[in-house]
Amino acid sequence: MKKFDNLGLDNIKEIFHNLSYDELNAHEKVNNEGLSTDNDTFCVDTGIFTGRSPKDKYFVKQDPSSKYIAWGKVNQPITKELFDKLLTKAKQELSGKKIYVQDAFCGASLQSRKAVRFVTEIAWQAHFVKNMFIRPSQEELENFKADFIVYNACKCINEDYKQDGLNSEVFVIFNVEENIAVIGGTWYGGEMKKGIFSMMNYWLPLENKLSMHCSANVGEKGDVALFFGLSGTGKTTLSTDPKRKLIGDDEHGWDDEGVFNFEGGCYAKTINLDPEHEPEIYGAIKRNALLENVVLRADKSVDYADASKTENTRVSYPIEHIENHEPSLKAGHPKNIIFLSADAFGILPPVSKLSKEQAMYYFLSGYTAKVAGTERGITEPQATFSACFGEPFMPLHPTVYARLLGEKIEKYEVNVYLVNTGWSGGSYGVGKRMSIKATRACINAILDGSITKCEFENFEVFDLAIPKALEGVESTLLNPINTWSDKNAYTETRDKLAHMFVQNFKRYEDVKEGIEFSKFGPKI
């Protein structure tokens, strides 16, 4: 117990330190924390919070970190006094209890990883941490020194939130100087995952290393590909390839040795999960996996189509559950970077080659378009821009990440492409969704290098280089203007989308670099 004195908890009944999967499973059952499914996967309910609470996330405003953090709606400030008050409250909640302490690494690169200690009173949350982060060896555990501590007091709420000037009784707070995070009021496991991701996005760029919200895989010849894309763009599907090993599906770093996964597991959506279309994920759901907010049938089988608790049903599992993964969780420098956008306006080409400067522009834009249904059944695509394809998790000014990306693209001579997995031949409602076959053909041409031998032409207004012909893709598809029957509607929609890009980018022009990068977007 003595080695846990620095946690600041009183009268702890018992500490369960780095339990095995079997031990955690036994505790989950004894504590009545959930149910076992027909194939012995444990299943929990995260309560009223079935997703992250971005409006309840804060950073303590103090020097020196305050001069690096980009304060605003994403990174909200909180005072040191209020942090101390809520940390004390969280520690009181965890005191006098049996607690679980789970130690893990974030980052598969020895030079870049961080050692994180998680403290919770819930066995399944320790299980989630064990699944999602990198599991230290026995020797590493014996010499473990935490760089950062997360207190997860999910049962603790802040009743005084109104007088404290906060958004709700939930709080997720990061103190960079003290290397502590405290979570209260939400049971959602993803807060721990994305919380440490946010911290990696603070630490690494200040060490001149890039942190990225992307998936990564590696080919038989050691060629690495990164896939960036917002939800619904096909990132998981397209980075899963029988001929390539998965490095990771969500969070990566890029240091002077190459690309490395931050995590030791995957956190996959399970709504409408189908063994035929997503056999890898389906096959990964077995003992040691942890299901969240799914509905069980009477025979304890999972009804993946049931969204009665939430659309955001999830499963976490150790990456070893994916057969075709890269065991070291790292590889060399990328050969190709692919930005995925599901453009529901039907304007972006199926594939475009980007210059280094354009890559920085489209990385900062982080564009996709969602289809939003309205009450009267009229559907109008909604443009979504998320800086660096992961804005909610980026504490620094987005241009910091873009500059690092540009430097690495240049240094390691990386090819960058923009791939549209969205609509063609018209906007949503008129055009049709790009076939997965055509998209796969574009991805394959990028990965096998054949696209570099193509003849390219200019795609007007957006000033993108697009191939004139590509094996496996109808030539008419390659330039969107050829797929629209109504050319006036095409021109109008193209100009409208270009204008959205330009308007969105104005928010980066508060710094010199942003003004510089803005020159590489659409010309209107």
UniProtKB/Swiss-Prot annotation:
Binds 1 Mn(2+) ion per subunit. Disulfide bonds: none annotated. Keywords: ATP-binding, Cytoplasm, Decarboxylase, Gluconeogenesis, Lyase, Manganese, Metal-binding, Nucleotide-binding. CDD domains: PEPCK_ATP (cd00484). It is found in: Cytoplasm. Pathway: Carbohydrate biosynthesis; gluconeogenesis. Its main location: cytoplasm. It holds the Pfam family PEPCK_ATP. Substrate binds at residues 52, 188, 194, 314. GO terms for biological process: gluconeogenesis. GO terms for cellular component: cytosol. Its cofactor is Mn(2+). GO terms for molecular function: ATP binding; metal ion binding; phosphoenolpyruvate carboxykinase (ATP) activity. It catalyses: oxaloacetate + ATP = phosphoenolpyruvate + ADP + CO2. It is an enzyme of class 4 (lyase). Transmembrane segments: none annotated. Its EC number is 4.1.1.49. Mn(2+) binds at residues 194, 213, 250. Involved in the gluconeogenesis. Catalyzes the conversion of oxaloacetate (OAA) to phosphoenolpyruvate (PEP) through direct phosphoryl transfer between the nucleoside triphosphate and OAA. NCBIfam families: pckA, PRK09344.1-1, PRK09344.1-2, PRK09344.1-3. Belongs to the phosphoenolpyruvate carboxykinase (ATP) family. This is Phosphoenolpyruvate carboxykinase (ATP). It comes from Campylobacter jejuni subsp. doylei (strain ATCC BAA-1458 / RM4099 / 269.97). The gene is pckA.
